[in-house]
Amino acid sequence: DLGWSRGLGDVYKRQASMISNDIKRIKLAVKECAELPIGGTAVGTGINTLEGFDTLVCSFITEETDIDFSVCTNKFELLSSQNPLSNLSSQLKICAGSLNKIANDIRWLASGPMAGIGELKLPSNEPGSSIMPGKVNPTQCEAVNMVYAQILGNDLTINYAGTNGNFELNTYRPIIASSIHESITLLSEVSESFTLNALDGLKANKEKIKENLDKSLMLV
């Protein structure tokens, strides 16, 4: 009914660009989280800590994990605030939202077989409905939808927890760590599952695309 794209290639490039840019932002957020307030003791003063303890610990953790950890510039801030982790959670949420949009677009384009758009064909990973022949359930798309809902909730929890530390010390780190770990795990696993069980087997319904194109009002 409206202007069309030049083909599915344009659609796929747009989707790939969304995820690629989201990954870049996640990597920047992860880098910020590698700055540690280690050696600040309870509130950031570093009282009763040996000189050089912070850099020594960061060097050890870097060697053990192969991740470049460093001492933060203001230990008072990172002991009281969890903004870097809140930012990482938000970037994970944004990436999950992009994946959610892609899944919904694919689900609608694959709807059918008779009354839907039907321009894409999803792989039949499991039996469809016994009373609706030809129907393919978009289970992988729905899995992405549910993961996005969970990550939205985790992000709200993390941001709430990050603002509820009293004075110099934030005691909400356990729920922040638990929630962000769940978000990372879910996003990683659903991305792999969606790729293997939906995207890799996705096919264009060329006949239906031509039919819809031939009936488009844009041809007037």
Language-model features: locations:
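Acidic, glycine-rich loop-and-beta core segments that form the ion-binding/anion-interacting portion
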Residues: 43-125
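Short acidic-hydrophobic sequence patches enriched in Asp/Glu that either
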Residues: 18, 49-57, 136-143
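Glycine-rich phosphate/diphosphate-binding loop of Rossmann-like nucleotide-binding domains
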Residues: 24-37
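Catalytic-core signal marking the mid-to-C-terminal active-site face
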Residues: 22, 77, 81, 85, ...
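Structural preference for solvent-exposed beta-strand-turn elements
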Residues: 10, 14-17, 24
